[in-house]
Design a protein with these regions (language model features):
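Hydrophobic alpha-helical transmembrane segments
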Residues: 1-13, 34-39, 58-71
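Canonical alpha-helical transmembrane segments
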Residues: 44, 65-81
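Membrane-helix boundary connector in multi-pass membrane proteins
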Residues: 98-117, 134
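Membrane-helix boundary elements
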Residues: 18-58
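Alpha-helical transmembrane segments of multipass membrane proteins
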Residues: 41-46, 75, 98-106, 127
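Structural signature of hydrophobic alpha-helical transmembrane segments
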Residues: 56-68, 87-91, 116-119
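Loop-to-transmembrane helix junctions at the membrane interface
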Residues: 75-97
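Membrane-water interface at the C-terminal end of transmembrane alpha helices
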Residues: 123-145
Length: 145
């Protein structure tokens, strides 16, 4: 019975191909927070009106929420990748906990329930993000390839 001969040395993987231009990457970096902010703003406005009629104040609330969310998300995406892995995870934890808590508070639930739910979401986010950054970055926060 024949067997495949071992290869010489260790097989190496080449770099991941980059099929998009730098301009496309820049547009994606800007479009992601804007689109996500619009979805978040619509969701917050829908939670706030509780199925009632759409009013001008509700639209204003949704757009202001969308702008603030998009700006904060853009800041987190810009700043967080420069931080050490522990602080990087804490930054995403705070962002996700606050964002979820704000959305949940618009539904009319009690503030204690909103805080408890947002702390639970933040705890799960911290566990997932810390694991991800701990296994994919070195101690200085640089990606391991």
């Amino acid at each position: 019975m024949t067997q495949a001969a071992p290869t010489t040395g260790m097989p190496r993987r080449g770099p991941t191909p980059d099929i998009f231009s730098p301009q496309t990457h820049l547009m994606g970096r800007l479009a992601f927070p804007v689109v996500t902010g619009l979805i978040y703003g619509y969701w917050a406005a829908a939670n706030r009106r509780s199925g009632g009629p759409i009013t001008g104040w509700n639209l204003l609330f949704g757009f202001v929420t969308a702008i603030v969310f998009a700006l904060v998300l853009f800041a987190v995406l810009t700043i967080a990748s420069r931080l050490r892995r522990e602080v990087h995870a804490v930054m995403w934890t705070a962002f996700m906990g606050i964002a979820f808590g704000f959305l949940y508070s618009q539904s009319g639930e009690s503030i204690l329930r909103c805080v408890a739910m947002s702390l639970a979401v933040a705890a799960v986010t911290f566990i997932v993000m810390f694991y991800r950054f701990y296994t994919h970055e070195d101690a200085a926060g640089h990606r391991i390839r």
